[in-house]
From Swiss-Prot:
Keyword Plastid found: no
Pfam families according to UniProt: DUF520
Species whose genome carries this gene: Campylobacter jejuni subsp. doylei (strain ATCC BAA-1458 / RM4099 / 269.97)
Protein's UniProt name: Nucleotide-binding protein JJD26997_1583
Higher taxonomy: Bacteria, Pseudomonadati, Campylobacterota, Epsilonproteobacteria, Campylobacterales
One example GO MF annotation: nucleotide binding
Family designation: Belongs to the YajQ family.
Length: 163
């Protein structure tokens, strides 16, 4: 039996789930009656995790955003991890949404501080874009998982490498 157990906290997105949400959103876009006759497009830049929405109507742009976010929720991606990058108007209204897939230093410090303030018998350390949590008992690690899930973070938190 291992003397110490550990896991990593990260904000990694499942690229396949992101792509599936994109495909489902495109399919719904094609079948929605309220969007018939209005030029609307949804594109996904997989490298940067950016959804590019465009519409000839500003009101329908918010409908497109709601469609994308609802599909992301159904695929298990936290909607708080989606940031609005830019909103442009002109002949076509455009909106860029970015799916955040990294833990920035501010959120990492917040998670680390919360874990240390919990008085659980665990050690946590920031390792780049991940946080390693080590404990002697798996129950303590599970308590940390629950604690981190309850935090109101704008990230898609995932737990990896439970040993």
């Amino acid at each position: 039996m291992a003397s110490e157990h550990s896991f990593d906290i990260s904000a990694a997105l499942d690229k396949q789930e992101l792509k599936n949400a994109f495909e489902q959103a495109k399919k719904e876009l094609d079948s929605r009656y309220d969007l018939k006759g209005i030029k609307c497009e949804i594109d996904l830049s997989e490298k940067e995790n950016i959804f590019k929405l465009s519409s000839s109507s500003e009101g329908k742009l918010d409908v497109l955003k709601d469609i994308v976010i609802s599909k992301l929720i159904k695929r298990g991606i936290n909607p708080n991890a989606i940031k609005e990058l830019s909103r442009e108007s002109g002949a076509m209204f455009r909106l860029n949404l970015k799916a955040n897939d990294t833990i920035d230093s501010e959120n990492a410090k917040k998670i680390n501080k919360t874990i240390k303030d919990s008085k659980l018998k665990v050690n946590s350390s920031i390792r780049g874009e991940e946080i390693r949590v080590v404990a002697k008992q798996i129950d303590d690690l599970q308590a940390v998982m629950k604690l981190v899930k309850e935090l109101d973070l704008e990230l898609n938190i995932s737990f990896k490498n439970l040993k």
